[in-house]
Each structure stands twice: as C-alpha cells, then as structure tokens.
Amino acid sequence: MTRRQTTTAQFVTGDAVFAGWRDDVLTGKGPVVFPHTLPVPEISPGHVTLLGGAPGAGKTALVMACVVEALRHTDTLRALVANVEMSPAALLDRQLARLSGLEAEVIRHRRFTAEHADRLDAGLATVESFVDRLAFLEPPFDLSNVAHAADA
C-alpha cells in the first residue's frame, strides 16, 4: 500500500532569510531583553520559554516572580498571565507575600496585626506600581483568546 501525503506546510528557505539575518548579525545590536532579578529565563519579544516540572515544584511561583520583576524594571512592559490552576487573587497574594516579606499564610487568611502594617503597605504600593500593566486571561485558555487579549 502506498500513501500519498499532501502538505500545506508553510516555510521559508535559508536563502530567503540569509541576507536580512546577516545584516542583523553584522549590526551588532542584540535583541530587546526585559530585565528582572533572576538570571533566567530571558524575557524578550518573540522569545518563548517553556518551563516544566513536577506538581508543586514552584513553576508558577518562579514565572510570576520573573514577570513581576520584569514589570517593575520596565515601565513600558505589559504582561498577560494565563493560569488554569490559580485565581488572579491567589497569584497576587503570593506576590504580596514575596514583595512584603510577610508570611504567605498571614496574607492568605488576612490575619494582619499592627506589626504587619509597614510591610503590608510597602508590598501593596509595589504591587500597585505595576498592576495596571498586568492582566489575567479568563477562559477559554486557547491561543485565540490569548491573541485577542494581547491586542486589547
């Protein structure tokens, strides 16, 4: 039995890319990279980073810390977070804990005392400084919705 394959593949040849790529290499200008406080991952336009790990390993915490730090360091950056497991409020609770130095449980259960006031105020002010450039995707969690949200 012979199979006939048809393809609708879209591609570009190396020849077609070479001249523009060579000029780009020779200009010596590197890509735009948004700074944050961790050595990895690199956050830049068109750069996709895939992070994997066991449940509870800290993937969400790491990514949110990178996103928040990049937002804090680049006033023109906007971020869209798509998380199917945690609510926006829970994600912000975690960042408030990290930024304020308060225990996550204290924030989660809202068990504040007078001794928490200064750190809570400082953490909230930090979150408020970038929250207007942070958005959370709502279902459906598909690429079409991501694209529409990015254009909004």
PLM features: what roles do these ranges have?
Residues 35-40, 69, 73-152:
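Cytosolic-facing regulatory segments adjacent to core modules
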Residues 2-102:
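The Walker A/P-loop phosphate-binding site
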Residues 1-2, 146:
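Generic low-polarity alpha-helical segments
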